[in-house]
Structures are given as C-alpha cells and as structure tokens.
Amino acid sequence: MEMRFSDDFLKALEFSRDEAVRTGWHNISPDHIMLGILRLDDSFVFDVLGCAGVPADGMKAALDDAVFVEEEVPWDERDSVVMSDGARSFLDHACLEARRCGSAVVEPLHFVLAACRVSGPYCHDYLDEHGVTLRSLVEAAGMKWEDYRLDRPAAEESPAPDPQLMADAIERRLREGYSTGIIPVS
C-alpha cells in the first residue's frame, strides 16, 4: 500500500522549510509545517479553523512570535535545513488522521487534526487555548463525529507507514521539489 500526500500538503512542506529559515531555525518543526499550511492560498484549512473559532491570521501571528529567534540562517544553507524528529512524528500522526477520516491521501487538514490531538508544539497549545477540540475540528470540516474512526486504531485498516521511509522520501522531495507525493509504506 502507498500513502499519498496531496499537492497542497507537499507545497506546505516546501513552505515549511522557508518558514524555518525565516524564523532562524536549522530544522523544521511541527510549528513550521503549520506555518507552511497557513501560507497555502485558498486552503480548506482556513474555513475549518474559522468554523472552529480560530482566525488563521491570529494563529500565524502567534506561531511566528513563539518560534522566531534572532539568529539568521543564511539562504545558501537552506538545503541543509531538515525535518526534526518531532516533525517526522507529526507527519506520521497526520497519516493516521487521514486513515481515521477514511482517506488514502494526506491533506493539510489531517496535519491540523494531528496538531489538535498531539501535545508538544505551539500549534497544539494555540488550538487548546482557543477551546478547539478534535471533535470541533472534525465537525467544522463537515464530517460526522460518529463516522470519524476514533474508537478504532487507524492501523486496523492498513499498516502504518514506516516513519524512516516516509521521512527519507519527504526529505528527498524537499530537496528536489514536490512531484507525485507517493510515499511507500511497509
């Protein structure tokens, strides 16, 4: 089986590297991926966040403030900026959220669902501080809570992607630019 990342999600991953460089980081964190998602034009995520009571512009400003450091990353070192272990773990969680939603394609929304579920990064804290729950996001996305497969492990339906294979494929795409977005899973 293959897990596929949508073109929008791959574009957000490319933006996440730019966000890491812009904010002075030498690696890409889950918050940089969220900032990359918030840079997408006309993304469904904006509608979902708005319905859940979170203005995307406010979230972007708060994340910028939280992750910005006064260290500059030279633009010529951009290609050496890689995913952190935390970002890789969040990508794995986004894959699981896609499966829980019944999708073989990982969309930016699935990352936002993962951010709501998994604590650690500032994006999770921001959603939590604004009273956003997993259920409110699922329903804001137009899904029925009863249809969301929270009660079953996502791996029941298909195997979880190998995190190292997935991370290697994403790193390669970040270096080469996104194309098909197909990630092999074991």
Q: Which residue ranges define each predicted feature?
A:
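Histone-fold recognition with a strong bias for associated Lys/Arg-rich disordered tails
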Residues: 1-186
